[in-house]
A protein has these predicted regions:
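Mid-to-C-terminal alpha-helical segments outside catalytic/metal-binding sites
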Residues: 1-9, 16-73, 100-108, 129-133, ...
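Generic beta-sheet signal
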Residues: 11, 118, 174-176, 228, ...
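Divalent metal-dependent hydrolysis catalytic cores, especially in the metallo-beta-lactamase
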Residues: 43-50, 63-86, 112-120, 141-145
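Surface-exposed, active-site-proximal loop segments in enzymatic domains
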Residues: 79-94, 125, 190-193
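Charged helix-capping and loop-helix junction motifs
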Residues: 91-99, 155-162
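Catalytic pocket-lining loop regions of alpha/beta-barrel enzymes
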Residues: 106, 133-291, 295
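Alpha-helical scaffold segments that form or flank carboxylate-/histidine-based iron centers
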Residues: 117-122, 126, 226
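Short glycine-enriched loops at secondary-structure junctions
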Residues: 121, 177-183, 302-304
């Protein structure tokens, strides 16, 4: 434990095997995928060798970076877009291999790493089986899904076997951004906004909101969803979302009129948010005030936003010592059963 009186547990920390990163770079260079957002993003990221080295290292170099910034434990998750840009068979094989690799790192460094399991939503039943293997046999602490899968979102009931598995296993699903899908991405790419600057939040906020309105959380009331970047703007919009969801129902295409709870109730009862990339006291304290102190977890967003000074900035958020311990340590321990 660091000298501040709590462990700093970072909950959205990316990794990937180098061979997967090489595949992304090749796909972007050859434009072998019909996804302008992916091509734009991995053309840029693929030109950053130090970033790739940090992503691929789940050993001594990463731990040295953690030590230099005061991070006690990282929860590792397969970087975006994970396996979700491949065909179902390839995706399932890559997910299983990645889970085996990251589980080995956790076994080697149990005091420094925990990890989430990658699954392939392309095959929901297979994803549910892999979730059970990864949690029960490998000891992984939840699932990572990098938002849309070839333009499809988890509000579609065909994916709900994944929700059923996560609820039965009592593990959360972390919905992490990727770039907007082809049917959405055009203006974002044209304006250079497809990545973390704006497109990530817009796409992932849409995805999570669609899940809230789908009825999935009535069918799976104990399902827990984790969302980064202080909630992808959804906490800021909760009042208006509730108002419009109520007053505009006759004009809204979906089953929203059959929901058992308001959208804000689903957010406060089923969703947790992390501070990844948002080391700014006004935002952190706002989200805590909206969702509650028990529902906000610290994250760094390593290695994409490896800024050790931001750890100190988050230490200095004007909340009580007890609430800082929740933010950095005990909320993560509870949500991920650490």
């Amino acid at each position: 434990m660091t000298a501040v009186g709590y462990k700093r547990i970072a909950t959205e920390e990316a990794w990937a095997p180098m061979e997967l990163l090489d595949t992304y770079r090749s796909m972007a260079a050859k434009k072998s995928i019909d996804d302008p957002g992916f091509i734009a993003l991995w053309t840029r990221l693929g030109a950053r060798p130090v970033l790739s080295e940090r992503l691929a290292d789940i050993g001594d170099r990463r731990i040295a970076d953690m030590d230099s910034s005061g991070i006690d434990l990282q929860i590792l998750s397969l970087t975006s877009p994970g396996v979700q840009v491949f065909d179902a068979q390839t995706a399932a094989s890559l997910a299983s291999s990645a889970n085996d690799q990251v589980a080995e790192a956790v076994r080697k460094y149990p005091a420094r790493f925990a990890a989430l399991a990658a699954v392939a939503p392309q095959d929901p039943r297979g994803a549910a089986r892999e979730a059970e293997r990864a949690v029960r046999r490998l000891g992984l602490k939840g699932l990572i899904i990098n938002s849309h899968t070839r333009g499809e979102h988890l509000d579609d009931p065909k994916f709900w076997e994944i929700f059923e598995a996560a609820e039965a296993l009592k593990v959360p699903i972390y919905i992490h951004p990727q770039g907007p899908p082809p049917q959405m991405v055009g203006p974002y790419v044209d304006k250079g906004l497809e990545g973390a600057l704006w497109g990530f939040a817009a796409e992932t906020g849409l995805h999570v909101l669609a899940i809230l309105r789908s009825g999935a959380l009535d069918r799976f009331p104990d399902l827990r969803i984790v969302v980064g970047h202080c909630g992808e703007a959804l906490p800021f919009w909760l009042f208006r979302l509730d108002y419009m969801n109520k007053t505009a129902r006759p004009f809204i295409r979906s089953g929203a009129d059959r929901l058992k709870r308001t959208l804000s109730e689903y957010m406060r009862e089923n969703v947790y948010v992390t501070t990844s990339g948002m080391a700014w006291a006004p935002v952190i304290t706002f989200v805590q005030s909206v969702l509650g102190m028990d529902r906000v977890l610290y994250a760094m967003d390593y290695p994409y936003q490896f800024e050790p000074d931001e750890v100190t900035a988050t230490d200095n958020v004007p909340i009580s010592d007890a609430d800082k311990k929740k933010l950095f340590q005990t909320n993560a321990e509870r949500v991920f059963a650490l």
